Amino acid sequence: MSKVISLLSSKGGAGKTTISTNLSQGLFRMGKRVLVADSDPQASSRDWSLQAPDEYNMVPVLGVGAKTMEKEIASVRDSYDYIIIDGAAKMEAAKMVPTIKVSDLVLVPVQPSSVDIWAIEDLIDVLKARLDAVGKPLVNFLISRQITGTVIAGDVFEVLKEKELPILNARTSQRVVFAEALSAGLSVYEAEPDGKAQQEIEALIEEVTGLIDG
């Protein structure tokens, strides 16, 4: 049975689709059976998949509905090693509960800004309530789109620690290649092999798989 990893945030622009597509493609290139489940009405991951050049072997993407999430994931769960759910943007936290229920791990990407932290307060409450009730899923913050050479990511790290949920050591940075790859239907593995962005994704994969497979 597959492990389900969800990228959830109540705020748009947090990097959910960028992380979902790159994380999944990295696992796919490792020989894993991987599916991206796109639950965002904006269909960003599905659009990404449609842009992929024919010469590249890219991870498959399936559109799923937030209301039918549990049934749809159950129907494909035995066919993959990992299912990565690209969560809907700007959705009320309470409506994310079906996605949370099917997840083994929820990653909450947070840009280094106070506004981003304020925007996910309700989601944090929902996740904590689920953990208190049933003891799962695993939940981790992921600092995303940090600007290298600044101290603000460190400041946000200190604020996130007060939320009493773990924070991944792996982070993603604000790099042009992430945006360029997404627009071209690629991941950083194809767009800039062995570059710094790929190194960040590989560090993320190592940490995430250690959490859910370890």
Where are each of the predicted segments found?
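P-loop/Walker-type NTP enzyme "switch/lid" segment
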Residues: 4-10, 14, 21-97, 133, ...
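Motif I (Walker A/P-loop) of helicase-class P-loop NTPases
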Residues: 17-21, 120-121
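Structural beta-sheet core signal
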Residues: 36, 85, 108, 141-143
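Inter-motif core of Ras-like GTPase G domains
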Residues: 94-114
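Conserved C-terminal guanine-recognition region of P-loop GTPase G domains, centered on the G4
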Residues: 120-135
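Beta-strand-loop-alpha "switch" segments that mediate conformational coupling across diverse proteins
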Residues: 147-149, 157-187
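Inter-lobe coupling/hinge region of RecA-like P-loop helicase motors
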Residues: 179-202
